[in-house]
UniProtKB/Swiss-Prot annotation:
Record-linked InterPro entries: Hist_DNA-bd, IHF-like_DNA-bd_dom_sf
SUPFAM superfamilies per record: IHF-like DNA-binding proteins
Record-given protein name: DNA-binding protein HU
Gene Ontology annotations for the cellular component aspect, listed alphabetically: cytosol
The family this protein is said to belong to: Belongs to the bacterial histone-like protein family.
Single GO MF annotation: structural constituent of chromatin
Taxonomic lineage of the native organism: Bacteria, Pseudomonadati, Campylobacterota, Epsilonproteobacteria, Campylobacterales
Job description of the protein: Histone-like DNA-binding protein which is capable of wrapping DNA to stabilize it, and thus to prevent its denaturation under extreme environmental conditions.
PANTHER family: DNA-BINDING PROTEIN HU, DNA-BINDING PROTEIN HU-BETA
One Pfam family matching this protein: Bac_DNA_binding
Amino acid sequence: MNKAEFIDLVKKAGKYNSKREAEEAINAFTLAVETALSKGESVELVGFGKFETAEQKGKEGKVPGSDKTYKTEDKRVPKFKPGKILKQKVEEGK
């Protein structure tokens, strides 16, 4: 599903009057989650899931086909843990 299709889905599910209103709601939600995560806070929506950050350790590796090696730095990455209700809905959709 692409963004335009998702906007249509949100418009119908949220009973918005226009696609613009639905898109503004989606944009507000994503901005709020981005803001919280960038501050190191987590966002928990009971039943849906939890958005949080995790530390990802740097890695060492070798470039295939050459003798060159590389190392990546440690970094903070976003993480999502689905909630119980979301897991059940996905399972029912099989």
